[in-house]
Amino acid sequence: MKPYDTEQDKKEQVREMFDRIAPAYDRLNHTLSFQIDKLWRRHVVRIVRRMQPRRILDVATGTGDLALAMARRMRGVQVLGVDLSENMLAEARRKATACGLDERVVLSLGDAERLEVADASVDVVTVAFGVRNFGDLGAGLREIARVLKPGGKVVILEFSTPRNPLFRRVYGLYSHRLLPAIGGMISKDRKAYEYLPASVDEFPAPECFMAMMREAGFKLSLIHI
């Protein structure tokens, strides 16, 4: 699905959407998740830290929250953050400079489906809340597999529709009614905050996504739903 009702392809619409909402993105992200998104990212950092990487690629880095958190918690690690949206990257660069991490976190404009990263050159690839925005999910997963060193790891943090019927009903009410209303009011782009929960609904179920990862060449070792 696409964020807007235009003839542009999904990738261009996603780029445009995040360029529009970038100034309010962090504030809305933390507020609308009740700060839980920070806990999820910390969990990812703990997982990645145990892998003892030297070079990390953070795909769909956005405003850089995960990339900066990894650099902050892992000394000596180089983090490359890639994103389609220049405005999101501008926010990330501002934050990297503010916390003195602009030399260890390299932020670049780029496409997850055509990464300008050498084959077998990174130890870990992370993607936080980004794979469902790929224009071609299979192509993006194959690119991630291409840039990983032999034995490298990918850590993906993503939403899925709750399985518990009661929780699913509450989630549906919040994500499809309240989230677009609040997000649209603050960001001035209601369509963006209608797309975000709808994109979760349309994302492949965990079992299907795992099958896609296997098809792209990954061996799954840890799954938490």
Regions found by a protein language model. Give the residues of each.
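Class I SAM-dependent methyltransferase SAM/SAH-binding core
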Residues: 55-59, 63-114
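Conserved alpha-helix/loop element of class I SAM-dependent methyltransferases that forms part
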Residues: 24-27, 34-55, 69
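C-terminal alpha-helical "lid/dimerization" subdomain adjacent to the S-adenosyl-L-methionine
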Residues: 157-212, 216
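N-terminal auxiliary segments of SAM/dcSAM-dependent transferases
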Residues: 1-16
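A short glycine-rich, Lys/Arg-flanked "PGG" loop and its adjoining helix->strand segment in the class I
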Residues: 138-150
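Hydrophobic beta-strand segment of the Class I
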Residues: 25, 125-126
